């Protein structure tokens, strides 16, 4: 029964999250549900998170990001615009080269390999890939596999950088603060702005519109965004389930042949982004944790959750991640067409 299966998923997610919190792992409330979802998927238990729940979680995350966006971040980006532009261009070029090599040296069709290797929002890439005739199940597998490895790598980097401070971050959590009018206004903001983002059909619009609207309203002192930990935990759980349940045993079997090349492409992209993060620490004089999360190849919501569980500069991270997302969305179709047309196929 679906109700029983959802109950079992909730229990397993809770147990894993508590375990991760006990060892002071960043983004424990994301990793627990994500791993639980993967376990269920690999055992052939088919559960699908309602789309409304995922969109609501994205809207809540958008409000969380808005809490940390200030006018100073625009100044930082403007002062360092050559570096920011270089990071975006290298990301686009790297994804194009990795996608080209993946199609060239694997059995993946051109469209599928191109869209699957694009470091944009996973959900957005899957939706756009469908419009361009790619195998969306393979694209989804590749995208969520990338998100899984990106999340794991980001959590490890964050944990290593925090060191003994990881325990202090977790100890400051207040799960059930008193309910105030600010919470009600924040939920209203999430509902209204999230609905607008959904109606506009923007990729990740249910996160981006609340993020922008919340930042404007809070900077104008019209609202004070308040998000208790219990509400954020629910949003993290929905995001984790979306990733974990996105894996499919049948599609995994189908992807076994090109899996080594897929993994190699993911690791190559991670290595390139880590190199860019090191460059950011040298030229922008920021800590490596902030630089790594800012250049990490998505997804936007996953990086936001991990950044929230650390002492990183959330505003800079989200500004860089949003710019990367839009640049990929704008150039993705052209890059995919180029790879599909010109990447030579290996003879069978």
From Swiss-Prot:
InterPro entries on file: AbrB_dup (IPR017516), AbrB_fam (IPR007820)
Top-level taxonomic group: Bacteria
Topology of the protein relative to the lipid bilayer: Multi-pass membrane protein
Bilayer-spanning residue ranges: 20-40, 59-79, 83-103, 138-158, 173-193, 196-216, 221-241, 259-279, 288-308, 315-335
Main localization category: membrane
UniProtKB keywords: Cell inner membrane, Cell membrane, Membrane, Transmembrane, Transmembrane helix
Pfam annotation, one family: AbrB
Places the protein is found: Cell inner membrane
Recorded GO CC terms: plasma membrane
GO biological process: regulation of gene expression
Family: Belongs to the AbrB family.
UniProt-listed PANTHER family: REGULATOR ABRB-RELATED
Protein's job: Seems to be involved in the regulation of AidB.
Listed name of the protein: Putative regulator AbrB
Designated gene of the protein: abrB
């Amino acid at each position: 029964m679906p109700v029983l299966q959802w109950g079992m998923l909730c229990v397993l997610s809770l147990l894993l999250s508590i375990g991760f919190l006990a060892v002071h792992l960043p983004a424990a409330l994301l990793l627990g549900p994500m791993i639980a979802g993967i376990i269920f998927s690999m055992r052939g238990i088919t559960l699908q998170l309602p789309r409304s729940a995922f969109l609501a979680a994205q809207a809540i995350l958008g409000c969380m990001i808005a809490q940390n966006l200030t006018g100073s971040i625009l100044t930082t980006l403007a002062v360092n615009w050559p570096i920011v532009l270089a990071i975006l261009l290298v990301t686009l070029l790297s994804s194009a080269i990795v996608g080209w090599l993946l199609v060239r040296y694997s059995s993946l069709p051109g469209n599928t390999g191109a869209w699957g290797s694009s470091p944009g929002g996973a959900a957005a890439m899957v939706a756009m890939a469908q419009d361009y005739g790619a195998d969306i199940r393979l694209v989804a597998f590749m995208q969520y596999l990338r998100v899984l490895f990106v999340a794991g790598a980001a959590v490890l980097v964050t944990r290593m950088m925090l060191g003994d401070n990881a325990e202090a971050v977790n100890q400051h959590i207040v799960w059930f603060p008193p309910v105030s009018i600010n919470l009600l206004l924040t939920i209203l903001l999430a509902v209204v702005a999230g609905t607008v983002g959904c109606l506009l059909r923007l990729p990740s619009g249910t996160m981006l519109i609340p993020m922008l609207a919340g930042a404007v309203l809070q900077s104008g002192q019209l609202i004070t965004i308040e998000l208790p930990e219990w509400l954020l935990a629910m949003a993290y759980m929905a995001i984790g389930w979306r990733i974990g349940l996105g894996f499919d045993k049948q599609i995994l079997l189908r992807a076994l042949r090109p899996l080594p090349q897929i993994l190699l492409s993911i690791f190559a992209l991670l290595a390139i982004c880590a190199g860019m993060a090191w460059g950011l620490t040298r030229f922008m004089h920021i800590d490596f944790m902030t630089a790594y999360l800012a250049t990490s190849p998505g997804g936007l919501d996953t990086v936001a959750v991990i950044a929230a569980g650390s002492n990183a500069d959330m505003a800079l991270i989200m500004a860089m991640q949003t710019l990367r997302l839009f640049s990929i969305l704008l150039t993705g179709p052209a890059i995919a067409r180029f790879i599909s047309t010109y990447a030579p196929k290996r003879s069978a």
